[in-house]
Design a protein with these regions (language model features):
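Polybasic, lysine-rich low-complexity intrinsically disordered segments
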Residues: 1-3
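Residue-level detector of intrinsically disordered terminal segments
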Residues: 6-8
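Nucleotide-state-sensitive switch-loop elements of NTP-binding domains
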Residues: 16-26, 32-66, 74, 83-169, ...
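P-loop (Walker A) phosphate-binding loop of NTP-binding proteins
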Residues: 71
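Hydrophobic positions on the alpha1 helix immediately C-terminal to the Walker A/P-loop
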Residues: 79
């Protein structure tokens, strides 16, 4: 029987220190590990994630949170890339949490919205994190709100959440952001 290696996480104190005050490379690596920890379903990881969030909370709450939603193909990724590049040009630090549909085989993201933001993704400073929706309704992933806190604690002053392509009734992102934009196709009704 083949065993799957267990994911070993650094201590929550190390992650917190790197997220809040580490070098740019250490910060990005710690953010990725922290969000992976948040998304994990293992009980011990859930405890670590709760502890980490407790340490990060004093460093959150100063970012503009922007939710972008719309039907598949409306141009959410294109809009976010243009907005992100503009904001970076204005001196802002931008994080993008892109929620993608989940693979029924692996459970991971299948569309890779990050690949559609080719100009933004090659910039040195923005942080772009694709996350699978894992069947969560409302266009966001189960731990999107917590992932936003990680981005805020890392000093990103604009956090953009791109929902999985949704209809008008799936607006969970509106309850976790300061501003919500619903992009629509021309001549599509409503």
């Amino acid at each position: 029987k083949k065993t799957v290696p267990r994911m070993v996480m650094p201590s929550t104190q190390t992650l917190r220190d790197d997220i809040v005050g580490g070098s740019a490379m250490a910060k990005r690596r710690a953010m990725a590990k922290a969000i992976t920890l948040l998304e994990s379903t293992r009980a011990d990881h859930r405890l670590q994630a709760d502890e980490l969030l407790t340490h990060l909370l004093p460093h959150t709450g100063l970012s503009l949170r922007l939710g972008i939603s719309g039907v598949p193909g409306v141009g959410k990724s294109t809009f976010i890339e243009a907005l992100g590049l503009y904001l970076i040009g204005q001196g802002h630090r931008v994080a993008v949490l892109a929620v993608d549909p989940s693979s029924t085989v692996s459970g991971g993201s299948i569309l890779g919205d990050k690949t559609r933001m080719e100009h933004l993704s090659v910039q040195a400073d923005p942080y772009i994190r694709p996350s699978p929706s894992s069947g969560t309704l409302g266009g966001v992933a189960e731990k999107t709100r917590e992932s936003m806190l990680v981005c805020e604690a890392a000093g990103y002053d604009v956090v953009i959440v791109e929902t999985v392509g949704v209809g008008q009734s799936e607006t969970a992102v509106a309850n976790m952001t300061d501003m919500f934009c619903l992009l629509q196709l021309p001549n599509a009704g409503d």
